[in-house]
């Protein structure tokens, strides 16, 4: 006689197995993803303040950093020469429009979805480029401008007009978001090359339909004065650096002439029996003496200018300035025949550091 399990008990057992298998298959990471998304959203900026009077456009400056090499690597290595040169009174820079996918700009978008990327531009600054007065205004007057440093081989700085935000040396990845109506003043570029990505953030249709208040922007007069003084200081620094480069190139040429004259005099003495013209030797020696006097004068003047540059350049920027000066001197086209003798006496082997 077999053992018979009641039907009700069978159903209970089947139900329990089904319930336990459902527990085993429950997808828990989804909850974690929701939490992660919420955390990422809260980390974002908020450009609108919700008050009893309604939505008010904020006038804060948002400063952060991002990894630009992975996001914008193609723009950093782009050597195309399709920038448009803007060379006006007190303003020199190169600019071109670019298309950037919205997903790469997620870090500068607001958490509430009130603003969207509209236009993007690349701004390139070379040595001496920048603004001594005025600022660059792009985008919607009721929007925001994100300024992202993609590359900086020199000493690059910027000032957000009317605020206390004055950066004397921007690093790669530095990001500043400010009201578009303030503009961005790029300080004069010292050495090297810098590339900035400018992103215009405009109000979305949702925000426009909801409505918002645009308050008057505040103004920091002390910061304006400080920015003006800094601009003049950078202008003087660039002038002295250009003078150092000029002196360096002249020294290269003077050393070259000295080496050639000394070598020529050596052969004159070596073949004294053949070359009997003592006047030629005297002329060569006279030229050598003049060249050495010029070298001594140039070295003295160079030392004076180096002291001036040291007093103007921040200590942490001296290596950047030194590398730029040395590179410019080595790229001098005045001395084409660089043999072993000339190179051993060239300025690149002197202690030319600040």
Curated annotation (Swiss-Prot):
<keyword id="KW-0426">Late protein</keyword>
<dbReference type="Pfam" id="PF04943">
    <property type="entry name" value="Pox_F11"/>
</dbReference>
<dbReference type="InterPro" id="IPR007027">
    <property type="entry name" value="Poxvirus_F11"/>
</dbReference>
<comment type="function">
    <text>Stimulates increases in peripheral microtubule dynamics and may increase the motility of the infected cells, contributing to cell-to-cell spread of the virus. Seems to inhibit the signaling via the GTPase RHOA and DIAPH1/mDia.</text>
</comment>
<comment type="similarity">
    <text>Belongs to the orthopoxvirus OPG055 family.</text>
</comment>
<protein>
    <recommendedName>
        <fullName>Protein OPG055</fullName>
    </recommendedName>
</protein>
């Amino acid at each position: 006689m077999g053992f018979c399990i009641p039907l009700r008990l069978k159903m209970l057992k089947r139900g329990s197995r089904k319930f336990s298998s459902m527990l085993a298959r429950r997808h828990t990471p989804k909850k974690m993803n929701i939490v992660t998304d919420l955390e990422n959203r809260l980390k974002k900026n908020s450009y609108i303040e919700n008050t009893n009077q309604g939505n008010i456009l904020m006038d804060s400056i948002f400063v952060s950093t991002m990894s630009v090499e992975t996001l914008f690597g193609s723009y950093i290595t782009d050597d195309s020469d399709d920038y448009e040169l803007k060379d006006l009174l007190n303003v020199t820079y190169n600019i071109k429009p670019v298309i950037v996918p919205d997903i790469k700009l997620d870090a500068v978008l607001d958490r509430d979805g009130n603003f969207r990327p509209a236009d993007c531009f690349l701004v390139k600054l070379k040595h001496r480029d920048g603004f001594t007065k005025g600022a660059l205004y792009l985008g919607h007057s009721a929007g925001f401008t994100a300024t992202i440093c993609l590359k900086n081989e020199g000493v690059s700085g910027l000032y957000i007009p009317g605020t206390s935000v004055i950066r004397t040396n921007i690093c790669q990845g530095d990001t500043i978001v400010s009201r578009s109506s303030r503009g961005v003043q790029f300080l004069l570029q010292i050495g090297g090359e810098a590339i900035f990505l400018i992103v215009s953030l405009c109000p979305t249709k949702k925000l426009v339909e909801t409505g918002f208040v645009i308050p008057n922007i505040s103004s920091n007069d002390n910061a304006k004065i400080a920015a003006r003084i800094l601009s003049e200081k950078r202008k003087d620094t660039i002038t002295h650096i250009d003078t150092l480069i000029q002196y360096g190139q002249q020294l290269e040429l003077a050393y070259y002439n000295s080496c050639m004259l000394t070598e020529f005099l050596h052969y004159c003495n070596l073949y004294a029996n053949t070359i009997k013209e003592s006047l030629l030797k005297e002329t060569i020696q006279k030229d050598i003496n003049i060249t050495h006097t010029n070298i001594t004068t140039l070295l003295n003047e160079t030392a004076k200018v180096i002291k001036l540059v040291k007093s103007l350049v921040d200590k942490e920027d001296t290596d950047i300035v030194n590398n730029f000066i040395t590179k410019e001197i080595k790229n001098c086209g005045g001395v084409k025949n660089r043999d072993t003798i000339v190179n051993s006496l060239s300025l690149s082997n002197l202690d030319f550091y600040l």
